[in-house]
Regions:
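Short, conserved structural patches
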Residues: 1-25, 149, 157-159, 163-225
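Charged, amphipathic alpha-helical linkers/stalks
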Residues: 3-92
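Proline-rich intrinsically disordered, low-complexity coils
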Residues: 2, 50, 60, 71, ...
């Protein structure tokens, strides 16, 4: 059966300093500009597969057992941003999956990110809060099958991981007026990456971003004439 794989998320979660993701990483000292290479020529096409990631994670299972994994099984497997990049580097020799990808640039990016805790936090691959929304034709307890070989963009997975690792923490926008107005953005739900049968039943919900504006009381407000 044909397999579909796609990602969906908010435009506010781009790799740039002015966006929400840039403000999230700035809180831990990570320069989001270093990750913009994931959107540029040479790395933008970098992809990994769930099966390739599972091999990098060193799961003690054979090829036959891999084919029997279910969405429920993936909910019990955790991966970090470093693991995701390692999977892309490991897949560098696959001319079909990563043709033309600058592996040296990925190695440099990994070296930079390794020093940051947020890039080493491990999150579930599957489940309601997982990096992947994996849909099996027979349900969550049925084998994923060919879905494990579906190619997913590395940049999409890294973006999802960084947002999910931040949880639902608010990020100040710096657009307010002291004592009058404060504006904060909160990621209610991170972007999702979906894998499943190409039968119209494979779906993913977009990232939800909530804007909160607090208006304080101030009796005397004057503006320069």
């Amino acid at each position: 059966e044909p397999v579909a794989a796609f990602s969906i998320g908010s435009q506010l979660l781009r790799f740039n300093n002015n966006g929400l993701l840039g403000r999230i990483t700035a809180l831990v000292g990570l320069d989001i500009e270093r990750l913009t290479i994931l959107d540029k020529n040479g790395i933008a096409n970098a992809k990994i597969t769930p099966s390739g990631l599972l091999k990098v994670l060193g799961l003690p299972i054979g090829v036959n057992d891999l084919a029997l994994l279910t969405p429920n099984d993936l909910a019990n497997v955790n991966a970090s941003v470093i693991d995701l990049i390692d999977a892309a580097i490991n897949a560098g020799s696959d001319s079909l999956l990563n043709a033309g990808v600058n592996i040296a640039a990925l190695v440099d990016l990994r070296a930079y990110l390794a020093a940051f805790q947020i890039a080493n936090i491990k999150l579930p691959l599957g489940g309601d809060k997982g990096l992947l929304a994996v849909i099996s034709a027979g349900g969550a307890a049925s084998p994923i099958g060919a879905g494990l070989d579906a190619a997913i963009g590395l940049g999409d997975l890294v973006r999802t991981h960084l947002v999910a690792a931040n949880g639902t923490n608010s990020v100040a926008l710096g657009l307010g007026l002291p004592g009058i107005l404060d504006a904060n953005l909160t990621v209610v739900e991170p972007p999702r990456n979906a894998i499943g049968p190409a039968n119209g039943q494979t779906k993913a919900r977009s990232a939800q971003v909530r804007l909160t504006v607090n208006i304080g009381e101030q009796k005397n407000v004057s503006t320069p004439g």
